[in-house]
């Protein structure tokens, strides 16, 4: 993906940067043989290089991508494993500093001296460390409060935001949903009672409808952060809501899923990344596994760098009613349906014959089923209103010190856990009192009954729909 007028898009400069990456990568076990003798005389030479897959990374082993001596490496990280096997990356201090500097340069109003950043990114993930580094470089005051942290459960995080007057909440997309529900339970309006003016969110799909809902609930600007464990930072969104790629850090190609050819403006395809600024674990033509859509034209914000919309992982695409749906499309439609009844708490279950969207209702007068149908025309769907606390038990969540990376969609047609609520995938259950046990048991019984009814429907469905 290149854009006229952007320095890194100059063919000569880009070719030199790609050649430098190939030279660095050759020092790793992963690329030692496959890049032997490779010389790039043109961009066409580069585009003929084979793709690197996640399977290649896994077969290379934890140390396989490391191209720098251990003496120069300061940071090791692993992917969460939500997409399969774990991948690793080794980073130098310069690798971290370049990503941090790019974020601060792209978002100067968000990260500035004196601004307080409540850093809720899990500390096994790179964004948490980038937030700390941005603060150390003069971009604010960071509060290290990772959400997978026994010391800072959700209630304490909310209290920290109140006490410190935090202006930036940085974390996974569900973080402001959970904190907003806890604030609501305590009679606190996040818009009026907190100083947060920016939600800096990444690590999971952040569809437009959810961005709108969160922005309205918090009275804050929503910024999307995009990257991966393997590639580090790939981009952040502008004020026009477009996700701009960091062309100084990575060269990105968008290739047609069927033909492998580059797609034009407005086209969809798999994202292939070559890192330009990583010394520790450089990567050449990595298929990151995501499907993106290129912007159809120049962005209204004036930024000439290419912009994309992340549609979801290619392997997570769902075939239903003759249509191929990306996870982001489904989650976006579900978020809009929930917003129609003044809620941000929802969970999607993919069944053989339909989508089931479960929504904690808040008394809004909209028609969530109509909204869902308008967003996903022709897709069989059902909206199930449930009582507050059925999908996200705020009280129980407040007592649980251990919270996992959340999911809002579960495909019951595939092997694995059949999740029905947000809480099932997030919480390590604490010891219950008698009152807690009675309340939890009643909720669990209702959920179990619903699960059995849905499972019975799976058994009765025609074989061809499974």
Where are these regions (language model features)?
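Nucleotide 5′-phosphate-binding alpha/beta core
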Residues: 1-78, 84-105, 163, 356-358, ...
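Core-facing hydrophobic residues within beta-strands of well-ordered domains
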Residues: 22, 196, 341-343
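Active-site phosphate/ATP/adenylate-binding loop shared across adenylate-forming ligases
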Residues: 54-198, 205-209, 213, 217
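A polyampholytic, Gly/Pro-enriched intrinsically disordered region
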Residues: 162-172, 217-221, 242-251, 402-413
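Structured loop/turn residues at beta-strand edges in well-structured enzyme cores
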Residues: 16, 164, 194, 220, ...
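AMP-binding/adenylate-forming catalytic core of the ANL superfamily
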Residues: 169, 272, 277-379, 404
């Amino acid at each position: 993906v290149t854009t006229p007028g952007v320095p890194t898009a100059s063919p000569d400069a880009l070719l030199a940067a790609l050649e430098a990456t190939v030279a660095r990568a050759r020092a790793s076990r992963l690329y030692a043989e496959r890049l032997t003798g490779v010389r790039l005389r043109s961009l066409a030479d580069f585009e003929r290089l084979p793709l690197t897959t996640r399977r290649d990374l896994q077969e290379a082993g934890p140390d396989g991508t490391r191209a720098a001596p251990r003496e120069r490496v300061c940071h090791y990280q692993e992917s969460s494993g939500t997409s399969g096997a774990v991948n690793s990356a080794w980073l130098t201090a310069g690798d971290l500093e370049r990503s941090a500097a790019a974020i601060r340069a792209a978002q100067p109003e968000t990260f500035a001296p004196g601004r307080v950043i409540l850093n809720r990114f899990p500390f096994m993930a790179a964004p948490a460390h980038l937030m700390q580094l941005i603060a150390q470089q003069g971009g604010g005051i960071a509060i290290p409060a990772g959400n997978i942290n026994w010391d800072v459960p959700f209630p304490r995080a909310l209290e920290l935001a109140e006490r410190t007057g935090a202006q930036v909440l940085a974390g996974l997309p569900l973080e402001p949903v959970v904190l907003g529900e806890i604030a609501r339970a305590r009679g606190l309006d996040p818009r009026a009672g907190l100083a947060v003016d920016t939600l800096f969110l990444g690590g999971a799909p952040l569809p437009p409808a959810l961005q709108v809902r969160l922005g309205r609930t918090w009275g804050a600007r929503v910024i999307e952060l995009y990257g991966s464990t393997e590639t580090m930072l790939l981009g952040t969104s502008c004020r026009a809501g477009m996700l701009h790629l960091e062309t100084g850090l990575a060269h990105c190609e968008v290739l047609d899923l069927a033909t492998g050819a580059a797609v034009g403006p407005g086209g969809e395809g798999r994202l292939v990344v070559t890192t330009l600024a990583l010394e520790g674990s450089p990567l050449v033509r990595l298929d990151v596994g995501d499907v993106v859509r290129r912007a159809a034209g120049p962005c209204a914000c004036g930024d000439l760098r290419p912009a994309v919309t992340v549609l979801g992982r290619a392997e997570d695409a769902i075939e239903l009613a003759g249509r191929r749906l990306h996870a982001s499309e489904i989650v976006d439609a579900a978020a809009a349906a929930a917003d129609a009844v003044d809620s941000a708490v929802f969970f999607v279950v993919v069944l053989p014959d339909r989508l089931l969207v479960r929504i904690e209702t808040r008394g809004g007068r909209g028609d969530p089923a109509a909204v869902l149908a308008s967003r996903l025309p022709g897709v069989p769907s059902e909206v199930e209103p449930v009582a507050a606390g059925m999908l996200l038990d705020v009280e129980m969540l407040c007592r649980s010190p251990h919270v996992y990376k959340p999911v809002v969609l579960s495909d019951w047609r595939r092997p694995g856990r059949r999740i029905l609520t947000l809480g099932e995938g997030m919480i390590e259950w604490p010891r219950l009192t008698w009152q807690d046990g009675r309340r939890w048991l009643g909720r669990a019984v209702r959920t179990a009954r619903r699960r059995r009814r849905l499972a019975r429907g799976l058994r009765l469905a025609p074989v061809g729909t499974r």
